[in-house]
Structures are given as structure tokens and as C-alpha cells.
């Protein structure tokens, strides 16, 4: 099996995503560009707690399976599109994290309200319009709206974070959720104060 170390890193990141409540059950996915230009991606509809290194699927740049017996994530086309658009990015994480997703329902961007999100994602995290996830369209909108940011919120869907490596993409997702929770709390206090 090729890339066993990288596959184990993906599984570890997925368990961290569960620990930080960024995903539930089999939702979301992780994709990693290899040093040979192929891609590792988590399988579709499989719970992360039961996933083994061999369950992570190895794909070529066109999305063809090179190694693995599982079906790759339904978001594969979108994620491969993002990799093509952002050559400096080697890791993508897609989550359904609740607070950042909530921001995407009511705002067009999450301002850089905490230093951690500023460092991990950029000055703001834009919100892309809703689109179905099973085609390249989600990747097209995510790339367009993200610009140079290392994260984008997908309206009514979730989040995609990016990094030069898996650690950066994971930190972006965690700090984004922290900032979204803080931002929504501040907005609630502001609204509450207006009604006193």
C-alpha cells in the first residue's frame, strides 16, 4: 500500500475533526496531494472511527482510482478542481461544522474577529452560494469566493479549509469554528442589548 504514513495522518486528522465537533458520523472529507501528483481522499459514507488506512482512496489527477476498494468521496470532483486552481495547496478539509455554517446562513463573510482565524485563514472568510456537492460546481464556487483566503464557507452546506499541509488545513477549520462561535455570540449580545 502506497502512502501509509499519509493515510494514517488523514485518519488522525479525521478523529481530531470529530473531537472538535467539526463533523458527525461520515460527513465531510479530507483530501491530500501526494509528492507524485496523485491524491488521497477519504471514502464516501464511511464513519471515521472505523476507517483504516487502506480505506483511504488513492486517485490520479483525473479522479481515477489508482489504489483502494472504496468509493471516493462524492465531493471528489470539487476538491480536485480546487487543487488544480491552487497549486500551493496540498491539503483540503471539508466539514459541516455548525457555527461556521450558521454564519454562512446569515452573512456574506466571517470577519477576522480573532487573531487565530486571521493567522489561519486570512482577513475574512467569504461565503460562497449554495450548490450541489456531487459535481465540480462546488469547487468552482469555492475557488472563486475564497480568493486568497485559506477557507471558504459554503452556504447551507459547510466549510472548506486549505493548507500547504494537513496540519494547516486542520488548524484553519478549528480556528474558523472558534471564530464563528465567538462572532455569533457577540452578535446575539448586540441584538439582545438593542431590545433592552
Please describe what each predicted stretch is.
Residues 1-193:
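Glycine-rich flexible loops
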Amino acid at each position: 500500500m502506497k502512502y501509509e504514513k499519509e493515510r494514517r495522518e488523514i485518519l488522525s486528522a479525521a478523529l481530531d475533526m470529530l473531537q472538535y465537533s467539526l463533523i458527525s458520523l461520515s460527513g465531510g472529507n479530507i483530501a491530500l496531494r501526494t509528492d507524485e501528483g496523485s491524491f488521497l481522499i477519504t471514502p464516501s459514507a464511511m464513519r471515521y472511527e472505523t476507517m483504516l488506512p487502506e480505506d483511504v482512496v488513492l486517485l490520479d489527477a483525473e479522479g481515477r482510482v489508482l489504489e483502494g476498494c472504496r468509493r471516493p468521496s462524492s465531493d471528489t470532483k470539487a476538491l480536485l478542481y480546487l487543487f488544480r486552481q491552487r497549486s500551493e495547496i496540498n491539503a483540503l478539509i471539508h466539514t459541516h461544522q455548525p457555527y461556521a455554517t450558521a454564519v454562512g446562513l446569515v452573512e456574506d463573510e466571517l470577519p477576522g474577529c480573532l487573531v487565530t482565524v486571521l493567522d489561519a485563514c486570512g482577513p475574512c472568510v467569504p461565503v460562497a452560494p449554495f450548490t450541489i456537492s456531487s459535481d465540480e460546481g462546488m469547487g468552482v464556487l469555492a475557488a472563486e469566493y475564497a480568493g486568497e483566503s485559506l477557507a471558504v464557507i459554503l452556504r447551507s452546506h459547510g466549510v472548506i479549509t486549505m493548507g500547504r499541509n494537513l496540519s494547516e488545513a486542520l488548524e484553519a477549520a478549528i480556528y474558523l469554528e472558534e471564530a464563528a462561535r465567538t462572532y455569533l455570540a457577540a452578535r446575539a449580545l448586540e441584538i439582545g442589548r438593542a431590545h433592552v
